Swiss-Prot record:
It is found in: Lysosome membrane. It comes from the Eukaryota. It is a multi-pass membrane protein. Belongs to the LIMR family. LMBRD1 subfamily. It comes from Nematostella vectensis. It holds the Pfam family LMBR1. GO terms for molecular function: cobalamin binding. The lineage of its organism: Eukaryota, Metazoa, Cnidaria, Anthozoa, Hexacorallia. Probable lysosomal cobalamin transporter. Required to export cobalamin from lysosomes allowing its conversion to cofactors. One of its GO terms (cellular component) is vacuolar membrane. The chain crosses the membrane at residues 8-28, 48-68, 102-122, 141-161, 189-209, 304-324, 352-372, 407-427, 495-515. This is Probable lysosomal cobalamin transporter. Keywords: Cobalamin, Cobalt, Glycoprotein, Lysosome, Membrane, Transmembrane, Transmembrane helix, Transport. Glycans are attached at residues 167, 444, 452, 459.
């Protein structure tokens, strides 16, 4: 039986809408942050396409979940069109899996080839150098990234990874779900290792930026800005004190006596501080008269509402991740299997919400996208506050309409890796939903009763099917796992090191989240010009060459 058209329409039409929204979102984000005075069309287009591809890898996940959920009825029976195993494979192993492969391959191509080339291509810009010479120079520096990608692909293709048992009787009951899913070619294993390496880097970026941004974002909205008028009065008083100190120092040397080195140094410090305070005072005066300050006053109630909402979402995510990590610590298969969780035992709030939301299509799709956008927005909040750093050395600043093309490409790579690692994070955030959606299976139940008709007691046994929630303990004949879950579980089985790193990385993410929460609570409020005042410090070029 062929797949009904309404199934394909309900699964792929929302995905098409998301594709359009992702293009608009990527274009707006890149254009909002780039410095228009120094931008190049090539770097702008590269950033937009790169961010779009990263968003697509995550946007495909709810389509994957919808298709496997729609294969079954609520009572756990297969629908007529999905009762045939070949039809199910045509959807999951052909259409969905191929789309995943294409998107992941494009993402790796951009990370290792296109973006490094465009970065060095911009660095080679000079009036005396032709475009061909710039391209040759950029290609020379980009070869190193291509070598790293090639090595990872070769290792993934030919390294002796963990193999499944040859004898069916040797299969552990906990791994029965993988019995039919471990058949993969060398090409898929090579791509998995390459993506796993990128995902691991993305996890480190999430721990550094996203965990902090999830607390910094809501508290910045809840606290708001200091009063520009009050801050200006404080700056004016500081200027008066500094001017008085400078006058007293100069008065000591009115007779032409040589100024001591101590007083000369102190006077120089006062003059520098006077210049900075004068600049700040002018900006505070302009802020009081500007339309932005007036709009912020009008929007203040909405800021507090959104701040409270974002804080609740952050706490809900924290609780869900903590419960899943605790569940894995108690009931997982251990580090040798990447801490895979056969059946979630502890109630996970986000998992419960997403499973029940799938009843009203496409409510779960909308909630899923909101969670993804919240992670992206929180990541950007962390990147803006921390800056782009390497080994704690600040390389670039990310500022609206003032971000250099090099920083923009760096930011795109960071967001791509964050979104890529978000697929693994979502697997911990809502494990049941990401693996099986709302699928049930029919479990045979035997009921024995005692019947007495003629004074003789007889045992009467009846059997019927009971709908139970799908779990890893069931084979693919009873439940169909999403492709994203198959990829992750298969990869964790073959290379347990990555699964263990993701598990302990999630714990570290929670620790950084709590640290950022405490810091955001005790941190003082900023003024409306603090971001602009910070942008007047050393330029990005000076930071890189320092």
């Amino acid at each position: 039986m062929t797949i009904p058209h309404e199934v394909l329409a309900q699964g792929w039409i929302p995905f098409t809408v998301v594709v359009v929204l992702a293009i608009l979102f990527s274009w707006f984000y890149i254009r909002y942050y780039q410095d228009h005075s120094q931008s190049e069309v090539s770097s702008t287009i590269t950033g937009i396409i790169a961010l779009f591809i990263a968003l697509m890898t995550t946007a495909l996940v709810p389509v994957d979940i919808f298709l496997v959920s729609y294969m079954k009825n609520d009572d756990g029976s297969w629908k007529p069109w999905s009762a045939n195993r070949m039809n199910r494979d045509d959807i999951e192993e052909t259409a969905v899996a191929t789309t995943y492969y294409i998107l992941y391959a494009l993402l790796a191509f951009f990370v290792f080839v296109i973006i490094p080339f465009m970065y060095f291509f911009f660095e080679e810009r000079d009036e005396d150098i032709t475009t061909a010479e710039r391209a040759c120079g950029a290609l020379k520096y980009s070869i190193g990234f291509l070598i790293v990608a090639s090595v990872l692909l070769l290792v993934g293709a030919f390294a002796p990874l963990k193999q499944p048992p040859k004898n069916v009787t040797e299969w552990d009951k906990r791994l029965i779900f993988l019995k039919d899913e471990l058949k993969s070619n060398n090409g898929e294993t090579a791509l998995s290792l390459l993506i796993g390496f990128l995902t691991l880097i993305g996890m480190l970026i999430m721990i550094t930026y996203t965990a902090y941004g999830m607390t910094a974002l809501p508290f910045s909205l809840l606290k708001g800005f200091k009063s520009a008028k009050t801050e200006q009065e404080s700056v004016t008083r500081r200027r008066s004190r500094n001017q008085e100190q400078a006058r007293l120092i100069k008065a000591q040397y009115m007779g032409g006596r040589a100024m001591s080195s101590r007083d000369r140094r102190r006077l120089s410090e006062l003059e520098k501080e006077e210049h900075a305070l004068a600049t700040r005072e002018r900006r505070l005066e302009a802020a009081q008269l500007g339309w932005l300050n007036k709009c912020l006053k009008l929007l203040r109630p909405f800021e507090m509402v959104f701040g409270a909402f974002f804080l609740l979402v952050a706490l809900l995510i924290f609780v869900s991740l903590f419960i899943t990590c605790l569940d894995k610590a108690l009931h997982s298969n251990g580090y040798q299997y990447g801490y895979s969780l056969p059946t979630p035992q502890l109630p996970n709030p986000i998992n419960i919400i997403m499973v029940y939301a799938q009843i009203v299509f496409p409510l779960d799709y909308c909630l899923f996208l909101l969670v993804v956008l919240y992670f992206v927005y929180s990541s950007m909040a962390g990147i803006r506050r921390v800056g782009i750093r390497c080994c704690w050395i600040k390389l670039f600043k990310v500022r609206p309409r003032r971000t250099l093309p090099q920083a923009l490409l760096f930011m795109c790579v960071m967001l791509m890796l964050i979104v890529l690692s978000l697929n693994v994070m979502l697997f911990s955030l809502a494990p049941q939903y990401v693996m099986y959606g709302s699928q049930n299976y029919r479990a045979n139940s035997t009921v024995t009763s005692l019947v007495n008709h003629t004074g003789i007691i007889q045992n009467v046994t009846t059997s019927h099917g009971i709908a139970k929630v799908c779990s890893m303990e069931m084979s693919s004949d009873h439940c169909t796992m999403t492709r994203i879950a198959v990829f992750l579980n298969r990869f964790f089985y073959k290379v347990w090191f990555f699964g263990a790193c993701y598990y302990w990385g999630t714990w570290l993410f929670l620790v950084v989240f709590m640290t950022g929460l405490i810091y955001s609570i005790v941190r003082k409020r900023k003024t409306v010009v603090d971001e602009e005042y910070d942008s007047s410090d050393d330029s990005d070029e000076e930071m890189v060459t320092a």
